Amino acid sequence: VTATTASAALRGKDYVKPETTQRVRDAARKLGYKINLSGRSLRSGRSDTITFLTSGLEGDYFSHLAMCVAEEVHKRDSHMLIELSRYLTDDNDLSYTFSDGIIAINAPRAVDILKRHPAVMLENYDTSLPVDTVNAPSDAGSRAAIEHLIARGCARIGIVGDNHDPNNPNIIPGSRDIRMRAAKETILAAGLPFDERRDFIKSSWSIDGGIEAGHGLAKKGKCKYDGLYCLNDGIALGILRGLADDGVSVPGDVRVIGFDGLSQSMYSVPTLTTVATDFKGMADTALTLLMRRIENLDDEFFPQTVNVGYKLIERESTAA
């Protein structure tokens, strides 16, 4: 084959016959040939590389989301770099100048960079930012969670995960605020009692925070709530442990539901009912929006905000 055809085959172009592409790739593998990404970038102006920008990968939520984005990037015959915004110094970092675009989550220090590069934000609730956004189904999912508890007969429902900082009242609303508001509205719409000062239960968004909250809720083997909606699965897993430590039965005394759909929820005792975010859909939508901007650099697009879907997975923690 010609050098042009070989190059197209290695780049996965669909106009090359599949059998030709396979022959070229087999030959390249046998010869130990590796694509020079820097050279390709110089010739085409594209590196076929995406930067995933996050403040950190601690916790299963961020690592799972990063894996889903990586899978979608790979499907598009591209590569992904992971950059931690906590180490960000300026916008001349190699990963940004080398990458075609950025997908960012929880990276407030990088806002100026995102404005100057093709970018998509995940879980962004600052409507003043002119950037495409893909969010979790915080509103619809929270309403579904409360409706599920009510359908299971719960009449005194607490919401666990209020980590609001009174010393920082100007913080941009995030998924926490959306989930708390939607849950409260659904409880009140059902004619059930709810007092913000009493029924928004403080907890950091972690298993340890949930354990501490569970200990605080359990009094001599009893809990004043018969249903608890935890704003993420980490909190819910901690709640299960904290309540169990103090002799409160789930679901016998209180039913518990989480949010996210992380894998650990399948293995807790009892197994955790959860609102599972469509992480794959989140990643696919983000890549679709990003590629539209990368492939049309000279075009102007109004920023879009997309909320992905969810699935309520019923398990033992809310069993009838």
Model segments located where?
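Non-catalytic positions within long, well-ordered alpha-helices that form the structural scaffold/packing
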Residues: 94-95, 150-153, 218
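Flexible loop/turn connectors
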Residues: 215-320
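Alpha-helical recognition/docking segments in bacterial nutrient-uptake
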Residues: 49-147, 223, 320
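Short beta-strand segments enriched in small/hydrophobic residues
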Residues: 5-8, 43-57, 156-169
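N-terminal helix-turn-helix DNA-binding module of bacterial transcription factors
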Residues: 1-48
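Hinge/beta->alpha junction and helix N-cap segments in small-molecule ligand-binding domains
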Residues: 19, 55-64, 84-90, 134-143, ...
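Periplasmic-binding protein-like
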Residues: 51, 98-105, 158-161, 222-232, ...
